[in-house]
């Protein structure tokens, strides 16, 4: 409180005495200019270095931050390019896998068809052989039956032609 009162008193006296030179007919511009230059020199001496240092540090901080941002941007661009390259490789690999799968499907389909065809041929051949075997068995059985009938009837004498006709009738 005392400081405020002292300041107010000093400022009031300055304003009262400032008019004195003008009232007496003289000017005090030269002493005021010298006082201002001394004040400016002291202010420059005391404040110039901290102000310069502040702005230099600010400039360096901004430059450093800019470099960091540029480095991050460059890194992000490189990562993006790398990700795009990996995506492209993955797409190519997927396309190759699809093509390979299609080719394998075609090959497997052909193999399965060929195997089925061979199995059908084998079954047909087996069936034909089985039919032939059954036919032979039937012919033998019929022949055996006819011969047994003939031998049982010894009294009956047959000629060769009748015998052959009889066998043919039984077989047919």
UniProtKB/Swiss-Prot annotation:
It is found in: Cell inner membrane. Pfam families: ATP-synt_B (PF00430). The keyword Membrane applies. It is a single-pass membrane protein. Keywords: ATP synthesis, Cell inner membrane, Cell membrane, CF(0), Hydrogen ion transport, Ion transport, Membrane, Transmembrane, Transmembrane helix, Transport. Its main location: membrane. One of its GO terms (molecular function) is proton-transporting ATP synthase activity, rotational mechanism. GO terms for cellular component: plasma membrane; proton-transporting ATP synthase complex. The chain crosses the membrane at residues 5-24. It comes from the Bacteria. F-type ATPases have 2 components, F(1) - the catalytic core - and F(0) - the membrane proton channel. F(1) has five subunits: alpha(3), beta(3), gamma(1), delta(1), epsilon(1). F(0) has three main subunits: a(1), b(2) and c(10-14). The alpha and beta chains form an alternating ring which encloses part of the gamma chain. F(1) is attached to F(0) by a central stalk formed by the gamma and epsilon chains, while a peripheral stalk is formed by the delta and b chains. Belongs to the ATPase B chain family. F(1)F(0) ATP synthase produces ATP from ADP in the presence of a proton or sodium gradient. F-type ATPases consist of two structural domains, F(1) containing the extramembraneous catalytic core and F(0) containing the membrane proton channel, linked together by a central stalk and a peripheral stalk. During catalysis, ATP synthesis in the catalytic domain of F(1) is coupled via a rotary mechanism of the central stalk subunits to proton translocation. HAMAP family: ATP_synth_b_bprime. NCBIfam families: PRK08475.1 (NF006292). This is ATP synthase subunit b. The lineage of its organism: Bacteria, Pseudomonadati, Campylobacterota, Epsilonproteobacteria, Nautiliales.
């Amino acid at each position: 409180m005392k400081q405020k009162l002292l300041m107010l008193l000093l400022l009031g006296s300055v304003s009262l005495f400032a008019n004195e030179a003008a009232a007496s007919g003289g000017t005090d511009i030269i002493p005021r200019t010298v006082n201002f230059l001394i004040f400016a020199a002291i202010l420059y001496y005391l404040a110039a270095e901290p102000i310069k240092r502040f702005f230099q540090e600010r400039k360096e901080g901004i430059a450093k931050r800019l470099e960091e941002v540029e480095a991050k941007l460059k890194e992000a661009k490189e990562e993006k390019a790398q990700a795009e390259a990996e995506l492209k490789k993955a797409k190519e690999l997927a396309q190759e896998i699809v093509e390979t799968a299609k080719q394998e499907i075609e090959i497997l389909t052909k193999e399965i068809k060929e195997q089925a065809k061979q199995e059908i041929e084998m079954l047909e051949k087996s069936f034909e052989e089985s039919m032939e075997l059954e036919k032979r068995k039937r012919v033998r059985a019929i022949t055996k039956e006819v011969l047994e009938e003939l031998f049982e009837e010894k009294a009956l004498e047959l000629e060769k032609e009748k015998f052959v006709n009889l066998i043919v009738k039984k077989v047919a």
